């Protein structure tokens, strides 16, 4: 979310130096970052069986997988990410919990079919335009058992009125400063959000989830420019 956007590869996820600091940067950039992992664990457990197979999209870094694996000792995971460096970081982060996690370097459309009992996509979908989001979510839906939960969380805030959009971006930048992020990095993050990130407004995000086949879509999280939803296959 910060310097991760400044390397040659998309969003910097192949730059070893930036990958190494991703967990710390994400925790500073996203209000309630670790709490979202706890909420995802609670929400998925409402319907997932004790021995659930969980599909984790954008799994690089490994912190959400670690939180889920710690809370649910009989769950197993497929971690999907196009960045080999991020998957390596995830397995390092997991430590002994890695024995319950397999990895797929690539995209969900060419990942194993499952079926899976639950899925997450945290801090992922805001990197994709609407068409790519819909295709990705449809690929997830096809891999889930009927009724299985999906938890998503990403950048999503009002886009229609330029003044309102700028208000939310300013709040996000102020939060980064208050979290101790260096001013130069805050400026780069602002440029990325304004010029490069294909952000949707919350109503559009919900509509894409429903168009992909998910039902009962409910927002469970809102913090400045971030929103989270749960839906069911």
Regions found by a protein language model. Give the residues of each.
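N-terminal, positively charged/glycine-rich alpha-helical extensions of SAM-dependent methyltransferases
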Residues: 1-21
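Conserved alpha-helix/loop element of class I SAM-dependent methyltransferases that forms part
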Residues: 32-50
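Class I SAM-dependent methyltransferase SAM/SAH-binding core
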Residues: 53-57, 61-110
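A short acidic, Gly/Pro-enriched loop at the edge of an enzyme's catalytic core
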Residues: 111-119
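A short glycine-rich, Lys/Arg-flanked "PGG" loop and its adjoining helix->strand segment in the class I
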Residues: 134-146
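Conserved class I S-adenosyl-L-methionine
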Residues: 149-178
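Short alpha-helix
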Residues: 195-212
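Core SAM-dependent methyltransferase catalytic element
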Residues: 212-233
